[in-house]
């Protein structure tokens, strides 16, 4: 089916507009800097010595400055959560743009990697040219101490060279540890290496303080390429033949021939030798604002998370899932948000994000998370909270909470699922443990659904193991019964899909009788499901929310952009596992 431009603009329009603006800024900055160092009269002599390497190194540096400043803004998660929840961002389309903060962070990171490669390659050429093209006439312009000096000395004995090598090493560690395989299998490595960005920014501020590249300051008394007759003062000579015979070098573009020569057959002689000065470091102007903002937020988050929570209970669920319920004074959160957990007994520095499956309300202060036991951190954390003999049992006695290790939380932080209650119709699709963001929304509806705009919720949950449905089977049954008792049976449409049939009889029973008729074997037929939703919600805007594997996300994303004959628009929102 053809793409609906109305749906495409709703889902992709603002994102692509922002991408175009960001890309234009990079291209404009690169090209403007390239022309400055290629044609600017103040860099005439430096360009003669270094050539194209000078232009590429400085142009790539300007792009690096821009992206090294922008990459920090998406990481100000407390600020983003505040903007999302405040009335200062009333537009839902603008709030949805905040969901792309992680994608923008990755885009800036990839750009930094690419242009760092260009920058390094250009400076390797510059180091060679500094050595080979050593200038006897303009000694202060040289970075090398003598002609044919080993270029490696410039790399390892100068401040820009040494800090540049260190930054390349740090960046390489951050890149390799950011791959999907390492993030999933060993999150510790990703966490520790990513915090090296503090070292990277310290090296960056030192990197620009070397002063190796210099520009000419006295253009008025020494135009680039002017004739010097070794006299103490300037004079005009009526010998145009002298100019054509002794001065073969053309004037650089952007700097015209002296009017005395072009109009009166006279040429201006140099009044003095050129003077050079190191470029003023500009990197700190780019990064100081975002870096200070980020550091201020980290300080605020440290103060906010400095008090440990009180663990109320710990439960072990099937398929290696653990639930923790806790309380903390003055803690508030909205459905769909997430927090980070920090347990010093497991790791002194690591913080791991988990979606809230239960939010505090006005009547109860308890909140909770569900953890899938994947990786060494969650395994060690489970072993601390649940003794081996109790890992397969139900809720632990409250009296044991005094033996729990100290646990600190940071947050809450915003996520796309906060918008699910702001649509009149929402479609929530979960794959496996991806159900956790929707659990807090279902709990909120169970508590009180009337204050929210939502009037119809389609909840689709796909699992391989039927035991996984037991994580929230009680919640789904209570929600179903609540709306039946309130004569609103069409408020929540629950569909559970099981991709494997082994042990299906284990969930069939009186306790979960309400779910039996909503349990299907196989995978959803997504196209038919979207057509059905569009048919029963003609002309409305349906919010589509997905948390699951990439294959599932791509399918729903594609269907959300397709046209339908009912005038229904699907707005796609996604959360990722990693």
Curated annotation (Swiss-Prot):
- Which residues does the annotated region (Mediates interaction with TLR4) include? 248-575
- Provide a GO CC annotation, any one: mitochondrion
On the tree of life, the source organism's domain of life is: Eukaryota
- Tissue spec: Expressed by distal tubular cells in kidney cortex and in endothelial cells (at protein level). Widely expressed. Strongly expressed in kidney and to a lower extent in heart, adipocytes, hepatoma, endothelial cells, skeletal muscle, brain, several brain tumor cell lines and airway epithelial cells.
One of the record's GO molecular function terms = NAD(P)H oxidase H2O2-forming activity
Taking every annotated instance into account, which residue ranges of this chain make up the domain Ferric oxidoreductase? 58-303
Which reaction does this chain catalyze?
A: NADPH + 2 O2 = 2 superoxide + NADP(+) + H(+); NADPH + O2 + H(+) = H2O2 + NADP(+)
The primary location reported for this protein is cytoplasm
Q: What is the effect of changing residue 248 to Q?
A: No effect on H2O2 or superoxide generation
| One GO term (biological process) | superoxide metabolic process
Q: Where in the cell is it found?
A: Cytoplasm; Endoplasmic reticulum membrane; Cell membrane; Cell junction, Focal adhesion
Query: What effect on the protein does mutating residue 222 to Q have, as reported in its record?
Result: Loss of H2O2 generation with predominant generation of superoxide
PTM section of the record: Deubiquitinated by USP19.
Q: Which UniProt keywords apply?
A: Cell junction, Cell membrane, Cytoplasm, Disulfide bond, Endoplasmic reticulum, Glycoprotein, Membrane, NADP, Nucleus, Oxidoreductase, Transmembrane, Transmembrane helix
Induction info reads:
By 7-ketocholesterol (at protein level).
* Domain named FAD-binding FR-type: residues: 304-419
Cytoplasmic compartment segments: 1-16, 84-103, 176-188, 446-578
Q: What is the effect of changing residue 16 to Q?
A: 50% reduction in H2O2 generation, without any effect on superoxide generation
Question: EC number(s) in its UniProt entry?
Answer: 1.6.3.1
Q: What does this protein do?
A: NADPH oxidase that catalyzes predominantly the reduction of oxygen to H2O2. Can also catalyze to a smaller extent, the reduction of oxygen to superoxide. May function as an oxygen sensor regulating the KCNK3/TASK-1 potassium channel and HIF1A activity. May regulate insulin signaling cascade. May play a role in apoptosis, bone resorption and lipolysaccharide-mediated activation of NFKB. May produce superoxide in the nucleus and play a role in regulating gene expression upon cell stimulation.
Subunit organization: Interacts with protein disulfide isomerase. Interacts with, relocalizes and stabilizes CYBA/p22phox. Interacts with TLR4. Interacts with PPP1R15A. Interacts with LRRC8A; this interaction prevents the ubiquitin-mediated degradation of LRRC8A.
Q: What's the protein called, per UniProt?
A: NADPH oxidase 4
* Naturally occurring in which organism (per UniProt): Homo sapiens (Human)
Instruction: Give the lineage.
Output: Eukaryota, Metazoa, Chordata, Craniata, Vertebrata
Q: Which gene encodes it?
A: NOX4
């Amino acid at each position: 089916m053809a793409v609906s431009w109305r749906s495409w603009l709703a889902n992709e329009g603002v994102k692509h507009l922002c991408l175009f603006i960001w890309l234009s800024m990079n291209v404009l900055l690169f090209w403007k800097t390239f022309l400055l160092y290629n044609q600017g009269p103040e860099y005439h002599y430096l360009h003669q010595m270094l050539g194209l390497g000078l232009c590429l190194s400085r142009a790539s540096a300007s792009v690096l400055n821009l992206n090294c400043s922008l990459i920090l803004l998406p990481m100000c998660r407390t600020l983003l959560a505040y903007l999302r929840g405040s009335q200062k961002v009333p537009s839902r389309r603008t709030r949805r743009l905040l969901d792309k903060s992680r994608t923008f962070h990755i885009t800036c990171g990839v750009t930094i990697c690419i242009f760092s490669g260009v920058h390094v390659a250009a400076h390797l050429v510059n180091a060679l040219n500094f050595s080979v093209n050593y200038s006897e006439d303009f000694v202060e312009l040289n970075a090398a101490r003598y002609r044919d000096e080993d270029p490696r000395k410039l790399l390892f004995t100068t401040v820009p060279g040494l800090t540049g090598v260190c930054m390349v090493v740090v960046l390489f560690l951050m890149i390799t540890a950011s791959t999907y395989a390492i993030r999933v299998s060993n999150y510790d490595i990703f966490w520790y290496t990513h915090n090296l960005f503090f070292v990277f920014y310290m090296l960056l501020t030192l990197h620009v303080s070397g002063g190796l590249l210099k520009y000419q300051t006295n253009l008025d008394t020494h135009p680039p390429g002017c004739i010097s007759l070794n006299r103490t003062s300037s004079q005009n000579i009526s010998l145009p033949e002298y100019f054509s015979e002794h001065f073969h070098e053309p004037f650089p573009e952007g700097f015209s021939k002296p009017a005395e020569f072009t109009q009166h057959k006279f040429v201006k002689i140099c009044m003095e030798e050129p003077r050079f000065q190191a470029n003023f470091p500009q990197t700190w102007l780019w990064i100081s604002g975002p870096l200070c903002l980020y550091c201020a937020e980290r300080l605020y988050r440290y103060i906010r998370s400095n008090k440990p929570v009180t663990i109320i209970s710990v439960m072990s669920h099937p398929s290696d899932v653990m639930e923790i319920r806790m309380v903390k004074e003055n803690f508030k959160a909205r459905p769909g948000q997430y927090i980070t957990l920090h347990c010093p007994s497991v790791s002194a520095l690591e913080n791991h994000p988990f979606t809230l499956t239960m939010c505090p309300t006005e009547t109860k202060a308890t909140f909770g998370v569900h953890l899938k036991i994947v990786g060494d951190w969650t395994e060690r954390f489970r072993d601390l909270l649940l003794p081996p003999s109790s890992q397969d049992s139900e809720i632990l006695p409250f009296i044991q909470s005094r033996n729990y290790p100290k646990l600190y939380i940071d947050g809450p932080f915003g996520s796309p699922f906060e918008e699910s209650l702001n649509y009149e119709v929402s479609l929530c699709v979960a794959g496996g443990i991806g159900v956790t963001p929707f659990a807090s929304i279902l709990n909120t509806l169970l508590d009180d659904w009337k204050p929210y705009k939502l009037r119809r919720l389609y909840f689709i949950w796909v699992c391989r193991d039927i035991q996984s449905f037991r994580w929230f089977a009680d919640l789904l049954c209570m929600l179903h019964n609540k709306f039946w008792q309130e004569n609103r049976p069409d408020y929540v449409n629950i569909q559970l899909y099981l991709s494997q049939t082994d042990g299906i009889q284990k969930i069939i029973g009186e306790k979960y009788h309400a779910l039996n008729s909503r349990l299907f074997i196989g995978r959803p037929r997504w196209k038919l499901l979207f057509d059905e939703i569009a048919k029963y919600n003609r002309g409305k805007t349906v919010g589509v929310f997905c948390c699951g594997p990439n294959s599932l996300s791509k399918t729903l994303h594609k269907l959300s952009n397709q046209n339908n004959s009912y005038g229904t628009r699907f707005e796609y929102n996604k959360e990722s596992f990693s």
